From Swiss-Prot:
A GO biological-process term: translation
Family: Belongs to the universal ribosomal protein uS9 family.
GO molecular function terms listed in the Swiss-Prot or TrEMBL record: RNA binding; structural constituent of ribosome
Protein name from the UniProt record: Small ribosomal subunit protein uS9
Keyword check for Lipid metabolism: no
Segments crossing the lipid bilayer: none
Keyword Cytoplasm: no
Record keywords, A-Z: Ribonucleoprotein, Ribosomal protein
UniProt source species: Rhodococcus erythropolis (strain PR4 / NBRC 100887)
PROSITE patterns, per the entry: RIBOSOMAL_S9
Length: 170
């Protein structure tokens, strides 16, 4: 092992390095402060609609603290499944504003999965109205695409939409 004297390290060099590190740290802090998102100010609540399968969701979004009111209930009460909760919060997390808005939603029709998908679409559409700059990121993530898949109708003469009774040649 070599001693600091042998490495030709003086206190002046150490102080110079410390000053450079401190200056870099100040620059990083300033960049982070500039990068933090400005608070949202809206003159009126944003209202949007989302649809998926048979579900229709109307969303009213206002600046707030991240509260969800779904048919008068909290997000955890209405959607006990964590997968649905993550699906719904995904657009807010993507634009880094998970606790910037209060969301009041009226959901009807369909089941939990369809309602969760419809709510995600409605929230993504509302975010675009608030900050149009987020559109490319939301589009790339696929949050603005209406999922057109729905149950195919049953046809007469068949048991289900496409299932037929077994064919007998003779």
């Amino acid at each position: 092992m070599t001693s600091p004297e042998e490495q030709n390290v003086s206190e002046e060099n150490i102080e110079a390095v410390e000053e450079l590190v401190a200056a870099d740290a100040v620059e990083v802090v300033e960049e982070v402060a500039a990068a933090t998102l400005a608070p949202i100010v809206l003159d009126r609540p944003v209202q949007t609609v989302g649809r998926r399968k048979e579900a229709v969701v109307r969303v009213r979004m206002t600046p707030g603290t991240g509260q969800f009111k779904l048919n008068g209930r909290t997000l955890e009460d209405y959607f006990p499944n964590k997968v649905h909760q993550q699906l719904i919060k995904a657009p807010l997390v993507l634009v880094e504003r998970p606790e910037s808005f209060d969301i009041i939603a009226l959901l009807h029709g369909g089941g939990p999965s369809g309602q969760a998908g419809a709510l995600r679409l409605a929230i993504a559409r509302a975010l675009i109205e608030v900050t149009p700059d987020d559109r490319p990121a939301l589009k790339r993530a696929g949050f603005l695409t209406r999922d057109a898949r729905a149950v195919e109708r049953k046809k007469y003469g068949l048991k289900k939409a496409r299932k037929a009774s077994q064919y007998s040649k003779r």
